[in-house]
Amino acid sequence: MEPTSTASIKTARWFLAALLAVNLYRAMTQSVTPGEAWNYDRFIGPSCTEALSRFDVNNHMLNTLLVRISTARFHLTELSLRLPSLLAGVLYLWVVFRMARRWFGDGPAFLAVVGLLTLNPIVVDALSEARGYGMALAFWMLALELILESVQSFSLQKLNLAAICLGLSVAAALPFAAPAVALLAVFLLWSKGSGADGVPSGSVRARPPGRALALIFFLTAFVLLAIPLNHAEWKTLGVGATSLRQTINEITALSLGTSLKVIAAIARVALALMAVAGVFASVRCWRRRDGALLALTGATLALTLVLLIAAHRWLHTPFPQDGAIYLIPLTVLPVTAAILKGHNKTAQIAFLCVSAVLLARYVSQFPSGMYAAGSQFAGARTLAKTLRAKAGHASVHIGASLAAEPIINYYRARYRQGNWRPIERLPLTGVYDFYVLTPTDAALIEQRHLHVLYRDTGLTLAQ
């Protein structure tokens, strides 16, 4: 990777710096999402003993552990809650820049890859929202980068670190088990081709210790997940998409902001073609160092899909939903590598045109405000401040709709409102001093002749 700094490289640096600033702004200013609030209320706020006594798929263990540390060290705020994800986002942006620079040089293709890997709305949200998906994606990408560096110049230390990163990605989000296992398996199989054209000299004698890397990967994930998973019940783990079709449809809708069936159908066909083409391209580049990115990512995409389908069929596990964010780099990287490696000008121009259309779509729906997962609760913080002002120091009993319950409990802790009685997750059959209602329970306002103190499209505060 040459140390030159061209216009495209400077543009990418300024763009990534601006994106980081937006991530920081959102982390500081946006209301907590239901997933963030649920995780805090069940697994971060309680004592370690209580938190470890139960587990569900919303508990992204590595993120939970780091958030416990950050909120204890800096006091509970939206920023301290999201600080681990924000730092993981910095890591992801750095890895994307480094990988794109190393494999795609500079120029339009370099900028296209950087944009496609960072501007997708799903990725933008993940880079600061207090969930484990962005963290898992960052560690998985770092593992891929370390493996690719070791392909070019063998380094056992980097391979060991890559195995640790893969384990951390699984600990950050369980859906990353499939791509983590797939990447490690593909690399270990690829490394058996040492000694072929393009492989660094000395690699034959320094083949990566497959069992050791697999053990490092397993132990890293095991240390963080063993105790929580020991308390898990299948009903709390078996939550997700019922088919790979549903997974692709949801990823496409969130990425492009449309639920058109024809777009989803095109995405499904394209993914299938990419997986098949990835296998063939991997075979062609299998033993060549300069084709390592295409070989590893193409084969990893195909094997990941195989693992998901096999696990669903024989282990009855669900398909991932938000956790399928790894499909973004697993499609962008091999496609770009294959097109640029082919040196076909027509294909390269077509790729840049399609990339421009996608990037324009991403920019048009850039999520500078509330996170998609909590868009209906964008006014939660304003509501909580209104409730705090109205309640004063009096002991108050608050009734909340089931969907709003974890959010109000979060703000009870956030603003240290000990005078608010803990909000229970129960139907609104009793009488309360204040009501926090979602549209499904809005009829209570008329039925009980309540006075509305605050209202937006997703939440209503009444007394």
Positions of the model-derived regions?
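Membrane-proximal helix-loop-helix interfaces that form the catalytic/acceptor-binding platform
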Residues: 12, 16-193, 205-351, 355-461
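Membrane-interfacial, low-structure loops and terminal tails that flank and connect transmembrane helices
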Residues: 1-5, 194-208
